C-alpha cells in the first residue's frame, strides 16, 4: 500500500530505523530483521521492546517493568516514567554504538533495547542495598534525608565527610565517628534543628556554609 511504499523510500536512504513495536507486529508489517536487512543492508535497526529476547512479545508498560524490579511503593504511582526515560538513554547509546560499528566494519546490525532492562539498571542501587531503609542514601544516614522545616521541607545531602562536617558544625552536632550519623539521636537532633528554621533561613545557611541542601514547600 501507499504507506509501505513511502516507508520503503525513507528506509532506502536512512541510517537508522528506531521502532517500539512488539517483534510480532514488526514481522506482520514485513519489517522483521531478516526482511529489513535483506532489502536494506546498510540500515541499522534499534528495536525498543518491553522485555528482552523471547519475552519481547509479552505486553507490559513502564509501570509493570518498574513493579517487577520492586520500584513501586504501596499503591502510589512512580513520580516519573523511569523505565521509559532510561530506555530512551539506552536507545541513544545503542544507536551511537551501532553507527560506530557500521563505520568501522561496514556491517549494519539490529540492536534490542528492553525497557525492563532499563528498569533493572535503575533499580541496582536498591538491589545493592544503597537505597534500602538501612542504606546510607536510603535514610539511615542522618545527613542524607528529608526533614520538616518551619514552613516546608528540606532535602539534605551532606553525605561526604566535608559536607557532613559542615552540617555538624552549623547544627552543633557532636559527631566523633562516622557511625554517629547512623544513630537515632543524631536524626532527632537534626529534625529539631531544621524544624525551627524557615526555608529562607536555610537557604542563607546553605549558601554561607557550602551545604548541599534544597528547600521545598
Region annotations inferred by a language model:
Residues 22, 100-104, 172:
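Hydrophobic/aromatic-lined pockets within catalytic cores
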Residues 21, 68, 158:
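Glycine-rich, N-terminal phosphate-binding loop of Rossmann-like dinucleotide-binding domains
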Residues 1-37:
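A structured beta-alpha segment of the ubiquitous adenosine-cofactor-binding alpha/beta core
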Residues 19, 45-47, 215:
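Hydrophobic residues in well-ordered beta-strands that form the structural core
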Amino acid at each position: 500500500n501507499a504507506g509501505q511504499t513511502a516507508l520503503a523510500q525513507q528506509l532506502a536512504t536512512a541510517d537508522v530505523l528506531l521502532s517500539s513495536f512488539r517483534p510480532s507486529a514488526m514481522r506482520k508489517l514485513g519489517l522483521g530483521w531478516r526482511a529489513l536487512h535483506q532489502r536494506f543492508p546498510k540500515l541499522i535497526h534499534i528495536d525498543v521492546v518491553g522485555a528482552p529476547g523471547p519475552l519481547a512479545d509479552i505486553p507490559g508498560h513502564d509501570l509493570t517493568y518498574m513493579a517487577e524490579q520492586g520500584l513501586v511503593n504501596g499503591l502510589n504511582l512512580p513520580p516519573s516514567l523511569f523505565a521509559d526515560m532510561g530506555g530512551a538513554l539506552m536507545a541513544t547509546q545503542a544507536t551511537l554504538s551501532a553507527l560506530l560499528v557500521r563505520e568501522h566494519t561496514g556491517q549494519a546490525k539490529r540492536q534490542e533495547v528492553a525497557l525492563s532492562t532499563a528498569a533493572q539498571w535503575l533499580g541496582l542501587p536498591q538491589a545493592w542495598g544503597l537505597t534500602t531503609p538501612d542504606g546510607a542514601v536510603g535514610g539511615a544516614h542522618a545527613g542524607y534525608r528529608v526533614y520538616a522545616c518551619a514552613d516546608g521541607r528540606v532535602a539534605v545531602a551532606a553525605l561526604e565527610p566535608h559536607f557532613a562536617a559542615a552540617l555538624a558544625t552549623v547544627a552543633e552536632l557532636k559527631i566523633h565517628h562516622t557511625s554517629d550519623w547512623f544513630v537515632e539521636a543524631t536524626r532527632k537532633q537534626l529534625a529539631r534543628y531544621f524544624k525551627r528554621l524557615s526555608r529562607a533561613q536555610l537557604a542563607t545557611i546553605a549558601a554561607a556554609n557550602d551545604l548541599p541542601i534544597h528547600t521545598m514547600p
